[in-house]
Amino acid sequence: MTLTPQSIASGQQNAQIGTDLVLETDTMRVWHLRLAPGETIPPHRHDRPYFWTVLTDGKGVSRFDDGQVVPITYKIGDTKNFADLTPSTGFVHDLSNTGDSDLIFVTVEFNTEGKTS
């Protein structure tokens, strides 16, 4: 099942990319994301450079605003960097934990203009 137009519109307004904001400065935000088995983080937007690192093995599925539905297998230490992301190249997605143990990530979101969204 893909994201609905309503969930995409809601996600475009949602800048909460984790479950806990643990640090915010003028130039970055550090988030923790913990999803229990079967849990989903709601659609949210990414519109600035960021990277994530997964702290646990697990499985998930992410639905994107372009209609993609992507199953993912994570291994501890996997990291993905979105260094060139901007408001014009941003995207909306959600993430569901389809595994049988918690999925835990740390995500660092950068703001090159000194403001966070």
Model-derived features: positions:
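Basic/polar N-terminal segments that are highly enriched at the extreme N-terminus
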Residues: 1-17, 113-117
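A short glycine-rich, His/Asp/Glu-containing loop-to-beta-strand
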Residues: 15-42, 48-52, 105-108
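Residue-level recognition of short, solvent-exposed, well-ordered loop/turn junctions
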Residues: 36, 55, 75-78
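Histidine-centered active-site/metal-ligand motif
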Residues: 44-46, 92-93
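Glycine- and acidic-residue-biased ligand/ion/polar-headgroup-sensing regions
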Residues: 47-66
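Short acidic-glycine-tyrosine-enriched beta hairpin
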Residues: 66-87
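Asparagine-centered strand-capping/turn motif at beta-strand->loop junctions
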Residues: 94-99
